[in-house]
Amino acid sequence: EYGEDFPYEQIYAEKRKLAAAYIEEHGVPAKPGLHDCLAYAQSRHICCAVASSTPLVRIRQYLEQLAVLPYFELIQSGEEIERGKPFPDIFLTVCSKLGTEPANAIVLEDSANGLRAAAAAAIPSVWIPDMVDIPADVKKTVWKELHSLLEVPAALEELR
């Protein structure tokens, strides 16, 4: 859309640098309902995992800053996965490591590629929009669309 000369890599690197500087100064912003959602899952003995393309060191740093690291039984970084999202590999790896069938898992996602990966893994997904909308074809693959993590406990109750 911007042409072959568009310096995507340079701009993306600058964006990462600015984001890292912001987080260094202000900390990681918690999504509304994060702690309540994780406390609900823990109270219902629902296993939680992180499956992110972010480097493992950074994932752990963010989870520690948010004081939520103990809620997660597994943290899976895309660094250790050959093919990233939208391929299903990261989600299938998490299911395998946890001994869970994909049909018995749920993916909470805010990105189109994450939702595509969940669909490719045959894992029901919940889309919680962030800053970017997703294409209509991806929306069709979503089990539920919620406005925030505050709504996740009620959605999970529907499955019980």
Segments predicted by a language model, with ranges:
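N-terminal-biased segments
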Residues: 1, 48, 63-66
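A metal-dependent, Asp-based hydrolase signature
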Residues: 1-22, 32, 40
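Pocket-edge positions in alpha/beta enzyme catalytic cores
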Residues: 3, 26-29, 82-83, 144
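Short coil/loop linkers at secondary-structure junctions
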Residues: 4-5, 29, 69, 101
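Conserved acidic
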Residues: 7-8, 26, 86, 110
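Short, acidic loop-to-helix structural element flanking the phosphoryl-transfer center
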Residues: 21-50, 56, 60
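Residue-level "hotspot" positions that anchor or transmit function at local structural transition points
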Residues: 29, 50-51, 82, 99
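Asp-based, Mg2+/Mn2+-dependent phosphohydrolase catalytic module
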Residues: 35, 39-42, 56-160
